[in-house]
Amino acid sequence: MGKNIAMKEARARAGLSQQELADKLGVSRQTINAIEKGDYNPTIWLCIGICRVLGLTLNDLFWDEE
């Protein structure tokens, strides 16, 4: 699993810290950090929540073209 650069960049564009995104999703900041580092594979429901908060699609954030 690689780093989720798209999610990190989208979060930054939205002006959210890891803690702010975590609070909106009801998860810990460590969970957001682990997803962005590629150390944690989130559930589909968490992926959908992240997409809703950031205003993007699953393809935008989680689809790997490689």
Report residues per predicted region.
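A short, Lys/Arg-rich alpha-helix, primarily the initiator
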Residues: 1-13
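Alpha-helical residues within the helix-turn-helix
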Residues: 12, 23, 52
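Residue-level detection of the helix-turn-helix DNA-binding "recognition helix"
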Residues: 12, 26, 37, 66
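Short alpha-helical DNA-recognition segment
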Residues: 16-34
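Key DNA-contact positions within bacterial/archaeal DNA-binding proteins
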Residues: 30, 40, 59
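DNA major-groove recognition helix of helix-turn-helix/homeodomain DNA-binding modules
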Residues: 45-60
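Short amphipathic recognition helices of helix-turn-helix/homeodomain-type DNA-binding modules
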Residues: 60-66
